[in-house]
Design a protein with these regions (language model features):
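RNA/tRNA-interacting regions in translation and RNA-turnover enzymes
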Residues: 1-208
Length: 208
């Protein structure tokens, strides 16, 4: 989540794109960086105003006299943020979160929290417009794991229903057929957290 001073944003919208060759950006601390085509940036119609998921730019930064704000709540590809962060030796609270992968459904929650905080600090604040651009849902991770594998690794035999119920409490959808559990992880565990049968095993082991 990042806030921009609307009066300094040129044009009617902000854009997320890869930087153009030889484009530059002045960061909040005054440092000027030279961008490459691999860097993801937030732009107005004039050019970059923030290094996506890492640092804000100085041009549209929030000042003491700011009264008109654009609130950007977004999600970015983990690899893109990681590569840009390494290139500029930048590691921020935001970039650390993005590098780990974020459930895209958390974007709505982030927006709601941002609005709530604005209203708490500035009760007179009015929200005049909203736009959802290029929404992409997090694909839920699907993993098949056999009952025999679980019994062997857990060191004890659990009832089929107990396994299904345990995973269900963690937000998984589970179907058991012919000795195989077909598990579908919740979105908030599908950004790299759950990807193989050992991950499913670990979820069960910590609760039984």
């Amino acid at each position: 989540t990042h806030a921009f001073d609307r009066t300094h944003v040129t044009g009617e919208k902000i854009i997320v794109r890869n930087a153009k060759i030889d484009e530059k950006l002045e960061l909040l601390d005054g440092e000027n960086i030279e961008l490459t085509h691999e860097d993801l940036v937030i732009c107005d119609i004039e050019g970059p105003i923030a290094l996506a998921g890492i640092r804000g730019g100085k041009k549209d930064s929030i000042l003491d006299d700011t009264i008109d704000v654009v609130l950007e709540v977004a999600n970015f590809t983990a690899g893109a943020i990681r590569n840009t962060g390494k290139r500029f030796d930048e590691k921020t609270d935001a970039s650390i979160r993005y590098e780990k992968g974020i459930d895209t459904q958390r974007v709505d929650q982030g927006l709601a929290l941002g609005i709530k905080l604005f209203k708490e600090i500035f009760p007179e604040a009015e929200f005049t417009a909203f736009k959802d651009v290029n929404p992409v849902e997090t694909k839920r991770a699907e993993v098949d794991v056999t009952k025999a594998f679980l019994d062997t690794r857990l060191g004890k035999v659990l009832d089929d229903n107990e396994i299904s119920d345990t995973l269900g409490r963690l937000g998984f959808d589970v179907e058991f057929k012919n000795g195989v559990f077909h598990t579908v992880a919740p979105t908030w565990r599908s950004t790299g957290d759950i990807s193989m049968r050992d991950d499913v095993l670990g979820e069960i082991a910590r609760l039984v």
